[in-house]
């Protein structure tokens, strides 16, 4: 059985600002509380390959992996996948943006499967993602809205 999650939030800011800030990977440690660093390894057309490193977990373990994101600005969609899968058989993420009367709706869809020897199974990771995504999305919303309020 594979895992699947969907989470979304509305950000009271123009879609251009939301798009630009959430696709500025070098600034992800400022947007997300869980990332200690984001190192861009390569850029080719609309595809970026990068290494994410998390802050140490409760056991002191630091998780790090390489991912790839391909952005389609015209369709307001970003497709990402883990290149170094770690405990996942695969992990695919779709970020979708939609302009709304209240600002910008940002929607994340994550499809994945855990390896048999992973510390959690698909259901466990689904729970973790569904607990953490709203927290991270709220931080992103707050940080973008703060910039939006100060940008003429």
From Swiss-Prot:
Q: Which CDD domains match?
A: TcmN_ARO-CYC_like (cd08860)
Keyword set, alphabetical order: Antibiotic biosynthesis
InterPro entries the record matches: COQ10_START, START-like_dom_sf
GO:BP terms for this protein? antibiotic biosynthetic process
UniProt cross-references to SUPFAM superfamilies, sorted A to Z:
Bet v1-like
> Pfam families, alphabetically?
Polyketide_cyc (PF03364)
Q: In which pathway does it act?
A: Antibiotic biosynthesis; curamycin biosynthesis
Family membership noted in the UniProt record = To polyketide cyclases.
Protein name per the record: Putative polyketide cyclase
Per the UniProt record, the source organism is Streptomyces cyaneus
Name the gene for this chain: curF
């Amino acid at each position: 059985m594979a895992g699947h999650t969907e989470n979304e939030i509305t950000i009271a800011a123009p879609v251009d600002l939301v798009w630009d800030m959430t696709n500025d990977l070098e600034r992800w440690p400022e947007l997300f509380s869980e990332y200690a660093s984001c190192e861009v390894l390569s850029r080719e057309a609309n595809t970026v390959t990068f290494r994410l490193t998390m802050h140490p977990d409760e056991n002191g373990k630091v998780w790090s992996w390489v991912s790839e994101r391909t952005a389609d600005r015209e369709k307001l969609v970003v497709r990402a996948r883990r290149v170094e899968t770690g405990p996942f058989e695969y992990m695919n993420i779709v970020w979708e943006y939609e302009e709304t009367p209240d600002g910008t709706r940002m929607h994340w869809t994550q499809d994945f499967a855990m390896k048999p020897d992973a510390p959690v199974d698909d259901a466990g990771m689904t729970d973790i993602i569904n607990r953490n995504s709203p927290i991270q999305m709220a931080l992103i919303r707050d940080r973008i809205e703060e910039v939006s309020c100060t940008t003429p």
